[in-house]
């Protein structure tokens, strides 16, 4: 297929047009007075959103060269969202400002490679400064403030996120689901829960709630199917003597073995419950090993030389309480040694660091949470489907941003941190051409606060000057149209978000500035439609078919 190639200024102008089109659509959502963007959907109602990355993902331009520019800036937004969970609009605004200023300098004959070097050195200095002014975040109130800001100033969401993080800890898993009701609520699960229920309803001990509740129970963990009762008999006899309940977790329990367990349960000989093992394949083996470590037992597996018929009581795990319903099993207060659990946690953390698959990482984090923290579910409620989707996206954003704040601390929000960090750039002593790159960054750092002010209907230049003349956390509160101490007012940004937005924006903008040629497929020329074949003219006679009605 033929290609079209654009060079130098012609290509950069097309890039700039695409960058501006995407950034202008995204940046109207910035700040507390950010506007909504309505996105048409081919099925169902239009989507109304104030989330920058959602807007960016929907944009596809007709001109291929302009679209290249737009897609590269889209990459800035999605990368920032992946790393920090928020700051997508800020990153887009910064990328547009850096590229726009840099493109002017390149058009005026400056060396793009030197400008890029200047930009990189400036960003390196700024990141170090942002980290030094960062304030660690610890208490419930500060976590709630970060959550509130990231959820577009929705205090309810901020409070729920803070409560969830307090309950499950830093390592815990917090998931977001749609609720059936109007209210947004929080549910937490203590202990280890996995998504497998009892194999027969006859194991239930609480008929009203259809649950099996076993206290001070022994746990038999086996990695194969159990169908032969003979293999189980020795361990059942030992359990009957001990008088403690028994939970059997195995790949499956069927036929004669399951029938015998049910009969013994109904006769009151044994308080017992059988559950299928969670997961599949290698992940199942790992999860059974987790359960064994948590409860202080062993996985009865022929791979390591343990046979089911030779199982002794010291191989069984123990837990203070086990609750099993038809879908889930929850093990509370397992008897595993703290040192063993810590070793297992360390191993899973190492696997999280090494894996390149997002899916594997998510599953490993779930396993980690089940061992050390717990699981919390935020159920998002709303009046309509459209509001539900918008609110759920905000909760997910706020959750990511709050985690980022706990990781690296917080800085004054509303674009103030960038203005305060800017002063460190004055100390840089670089060659003249590189200094132009530093100046590009200086101008770009004003852009987020300028845009926040403009979205609030205020002149951005006046706000920038006034905030620059202030000190420390002094900044502009666009929500109330007043100048305040941003930290005291609870207007804060996670350091990770501010840092990632700047690094990603400068990286892509620098690449675009140093691009000299752009190649795209040549559009197909739409010629005149081919004439109808001559023989089809006789179809005109079909008009007479009307009389057949």
Swiss-Prot record:
InterPro entries: Chaperonin_Cpn60_CS (IPR018370), Cpn60/GroEL (IPR001844), Cpn60/GroEL/TCP-1 (IPR002423), GroEL-like_apical_dom_sf (IPR027409), GROEL-like_equatorial_sf (IPR027413), TCP-1-like_intermed_sf (IPR027410). The keyword Cytoplasm applies. One of its GO terms (molecular function) is isomerase activity. The keyword Repeat does not apply. Keywords: ATP-binding, Chaperone, Cytoplasm, Isomerase, Nucleotide-binding. GO terms for cellular component: cytoplasm. Its EC number is 5.6.1.7. ATP binds at residues 29-32, 50, 86-90, 414, 477-479, 493. It is found in: Cytoplasm. It comes from the Bacteria. It catalyses: ATP + H2O + a folded polypeptide = ADP + phosphate + an unfolded polypeptide. CDD domains: GroEL (cd03344). GO terms for biological process: protein refolding. Together with its co-chaperonin GroES, plays an essential role in assisting protein folding. The GroEL-GroES system forms a nano-cage that allows encapsulation of the non-native substrate proteins and provides a physical environment optimized to promote and accelerate protein folding. Belongs to the chaperonin (HSP60) family. Forms a cylinder of 14 subunits composed of two heptameric rings stacked back-to-back. Interacts with the co-chaperonin GroES. This is Chaperonin GroEL. It comes from Geotalea daltonii (strain DSM 22248 / JCM 15807 / FRC-32) (Geobacter daltonii).
